[in-house]
Amino acid sequence: MDIRYSCNQKDFKRYTTEEMRDEMLITGLYKADEMVAVYSHVDRMVTLGCMPVHEEVSIDKGIDVWANFGTHYFLERREIGIFNIGDGAGTVTADGKEYHLNYKDCLYLTKGNQKVTFKSDDPEHPAKFYMVSAPAHCSYENKLITIEQAAKRPLGSVETCNKRTINQFIHPSVLKTCQLSMGMTALEPGSNWNTMPSHTHERRMEIYTYFELPEGQVVFHMCGEPTQTRHIVMHNEDAVISPSWSIHSGVGTSNYTFIWAMGGENMEFD
């Protein structure tokens, strides 16, 4: 498991491009039959990627759960949101119950699920499971939310190059969680700016992952304090960590889709 420590805004001003990318950028999440995990000390969030091809992959494969979390199993004191962004469908099994995820479907697993595994329906077209996990203090209910069931909020306009639809999956309007919130924002063709106006939220960090970005295209992800902005060039299926003091916005050379994940104190937000 890759460990990322939190940085502060005063030090961040002096970072080189390489230091900034090492601190915030997450790449290479999808390796065949492996579980890739990045632990951030910003709100203790864990970002994971899994592309099962020929095997059924356990959530703790390659992870020393006791050494990293001080628990006996991954979700003993954690909750997790799972999206399928792969070419094919896949199945998540949690304590013996199977959940089938098509493209862009989401699964919320609450604290206390002991055995969690991932598999693809077709090895020629594997699922890609993108996940974010946050600490949890109590248990709610596991829930599968399809893309059709997500709460939808159209925003922006063609004139401002940010016409988009926010799909709220793991959100107070859809289900209860301890602190995790996740959703998916899809930009329409001809639009390339997301999250405008850019902003910060003092009580929540945020993680973005960009996908549906055509080959050869990139996203310039904006970060830093509002008066000291920087950018990180990102490619398809990269993810990026945003501390609470950092803006998080981006512009692409094409339209794209991104998944946002937040953890923190408050749950009420637009």
Feature names for model-found ranges:
Residues L101-D121, V233-S254, I259-G263:
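Conserved metal-binding segment of the jelly-roll/cupin
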Residues G28-N68, K163-E206:
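A short glycine-rich, His/Asp/Glu-containing loop-to-beta-strand
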Residues P123-R164, G224, I259-D270:
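Double-stranded beta-helix
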Residues F74-N102, F211-N236:
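A short beta-strand-loop-beta hairpin characteristic of the jelly-roll/cupin
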Residues D2-I85, A89:
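N-terminal non-catalytic cap/leader segment that marks the start of a structured domain
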Residues Y39, D43, K176-I247, V251-N255:
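Acidic/His-leaning functional-site neighborhoods
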Residues P52-V53, G88, E215, P226, ...:
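Short, glycine-/Ser/Thr-/acidic-enriched flexible segments
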Residues G86, G90-P126, V132-P135:
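Acidic, low-complexity central loop/insert segments
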